[in-house]
Amino acid sequence: EQRLNSLLCLLESYLSAFPSSTNTAESPDISLFDHLKTTAAIGVCISEYLAAEQETQFKKRLFDNEKQFMDEQAFLLYSADFSGIQKFIYTVASDKALRSLRSRSFFLELAMEHYADELLSLCGVGRANLLYTGGGHCYMLLPNTTEVRAAIERWNRRFNDWLSEQFGISLFLAHGYTPCSGNELVDFPAERSPYKKMFRCVSSALAGHCLLYTSPSPRDKRQS
């Protein structure tokens, strides 16, 4: 796994400025690195998905029945987002405030990187499946299997338990995911805007998880 991550770093260093397509009729807006990284992410998701279903007839499933497989929800689009960032960062004493702001921002970035790395490992995939991370937010493409969904819930619960022990209720990591197919990832059919709907579903799942965190419990309501 460490060697794969090192290879990914090397590819990013040397191939980020090269276009994935050399066809002059096409717009060179995607780097060769991004193309390779995304292809690897999709490939490992398909591999894990088929392994979970104990599929052995890969050619038949993926090529002979390509149209059918493209409609299968073999992937999970996953997202996680820190809730309470503004309050956590800016609730500082005026003395040495700038240093405190920087350290807290750095902590959040480090915490998200740790969360993402651990989750990717638990799901049996690598950094290629991390689509984006930054600003206390991340997106991942994961295999849609029972084991992966269980790992997602366990790790998020464990991570939030640790946040609660360290910071009380001031910081929480909301998360959400939605199953998606190959056709949805390539926005087909375009007239139905499946790509937009896919991200809308993830955002709704995130908001729902965050709402559970911010809503008072029955016990809190009785005490108030």
PLM region descriptions:
Residues 1-219, 224:
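Regulatory and interdomain segments flanking nucleotide-handling catalytic cores
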